[in-house]
UniProtKB/Swiss-Prot annotation:
Single biological process term from Gene Ontology: isopentenyl diphosphate biosynthetic process, methylerythritol 4-phosphate pathway involved in terpenoid biosynthetic process
HAMAP family: DXP_reductoisom (MF_00183)
Residues binding Mn(2+): 134, 136, 203
Keyword annotations of the record: Isoprene biosynthesis, Manganese, Metal-binding, NADP, Oxidoreductase
Keyword Zinc included in the entry's annotation: no
Protein name: 1-deoxy-D-xylulose 5-phosphate reductoisomerase
Any GO MF annotation of the entry: manganese ion binding
Pfam families: DXP_redisom_C, DXP_reductoisom, DXPR_C
EC number: 1.1.1.267
Pathway in which this enzyme or protein is active: Isoprenoid biosynthesis; isopentenyl diphosphate biosynthesis via DXP pathway; isopentenyl diphosphate from 1-deoxy-D-xylulose 5-phosphate: step 1/6
NCBIfam families with a match to the protein in the record: Dxr (TIGR00243)
Binding site residues for 1-deoxy-D-xylulose 5-phosphate: 115, 135-136, 158, 181, 194, 199-200, 203
Keyword NADP attributed: yes
Length: 365
């Protein structure tokens, strides 16, 4: 298979699954973590390698029979060169959209961890041919197998790093504070997205595209033991329960059959601590966009672009935590009537929103 974003949290866990089950790895890609990439090359011996930063390409220790590609264009060229029919897209951010589109254009199977592909480009992807690498959407897929049409889909959120932090203290929190997720070990961006609830908004949008319904809600479940629930028309409700470990969703997305233990079973006696809570829209204002984006899915491009600018500015110390939500809401208002007809328009709108957001952060709109 091909693993895009192999040095990140999803990528490294996917490689462990490949190693455990004897799956050969034809190609790897990464952004900047060349040291880890070189370790992966030595261990998995891929035929093709791609690095996003061309200036780092000389540091890649490719094997004699390997070929190296560079940049966003090189990544698409690498996909064309690969014979593997399975592509795991674990790239972070909007940069993952073009590879997702290319993967399906080539007729390859897409195991998708890149949320932004569906958030920004869901209308141009064949979602029936996507295997989601996400605990919530894997849970929904599991619960919906061979069942009648659901009444409502429910995904859960932990509440992120600041779930128990008083709202009055949020103005002063730092990136290091925000990166302390209570339950999951994830990359920096998704951990910040969890703290603002942007991640859950994105997952609602993913569920909209994957399962073809706008009857989607999210609740806070602080233990991260219950990942998804499905309510059926007859009044019954089922829940998907497992430990907070992405290897479960990864294994089901990349393997033909999963017939052995992947993660330790959940401690059922610990379920006594499970409680569900509404999402406080004053504390998590980004989530207030849920109904709007379910009605106008093209807004996903806008929300994602503004959020990426805000998150990375916060991580660099260029804005405050609350500025992320502020600028996302401002962009959603400014581009409320956005309409996207072609793939090219996605990239044009993305660029326009990023420029608006950067100006907004500087001007404190």
């Amino acid at each position: 298979m091909v693993i895009l974003g192999s040095t990140g949290s999803i990528g490294t866990n996917t490689l462990e699954i490949c190693s455990r089950h004897g799956v050969s790895v034809e190609a790897l890609s990464c952004a900047k973590n060349i040291a880890l990439l070189n370790e992966q090359i030595a261990r998995f011996r891929p035929k093709f390698v791609c690095v996003a930063d061309e200036s780092l390409a000389s540091e890649v220790k490719i094997l004699k029979k390997s070929q190296i590609f560079v940049g966003a264009g090189g990544l698409l060229e690498m996909l064309e060169a690969c014979h593997s029919q399975k592509v795991v897209n674990a790239i972070v951010g909007f940069a993952g959209l073009a590879p997702s589109l290319k993967t399906q254009e080539l007729g390859k199977s897409l195991a998708l961890a890149n949320k932004e592909s569906l958030v920004a480009g869901g209308k141009f992807l064949d979602t029936a041919k996507i295997s989601p690498i996400d605990s919530e959407h894997f849970g929904l897929k599991f619960l919906l197998q061979n069942r009648t049409a659901p009444n409502r889909l429910i995904i859960t959120a932990s509440g992120g790093a600041f779930y128990r932090t008083p709202m009055k203290n949020l103005a002063k929190v730092t990136p290091s504070d925000a990166l302390k997720h209570p339950n999951w070990s994830m990359g920096a961006k998704i951990t910040i997205d969890s703290a603002t609830m942007a991640n859950k908004l994105f997952e609602v949008m993913e569920a909209f595209w994957l399962y073809g319904t706008s009857r989607i809600d999210a609740l806070i479940e602080p233990t991260s033991m219950v990942h998804a629930l499905v309510e059926f028309m007859d009044g019954s409700c089922t829940a998907h329960i497992s430990r907070a470990d992405m290897k479960l969703a990864i294994a089901h997305a990349v393997l033909e059959n999963v017939s052995e233990n992947v993660v330790a079973h959940a401690d059922l006696l610990a379920l006594k601590d499970i409680k569900f809570h509404k999402i406080n829209l004053k504390k998590y204002p980004i989530f207030s966009l849920k109904e709007q984006v379910l009605e106008r899915a093209d807004l996903g491009v806008v929300i994602n672009a503004a959020n990426e600018v805000g998150v990375f500015a916060f991580l660099k110390g260029e804005c405050r935590f609350l500025d992320i939500s502020r600028i996302v809401l401002a962009a959603a208002k400014r581009f409320a009537d956005v309409k996207i007809e072609t793939k090219d328009e996605i990239f044009a709108i993305d660029a326009e929103v990023r420029n608006f957001t950067k100006r907004g952060l500087n001007a404190k709109i």
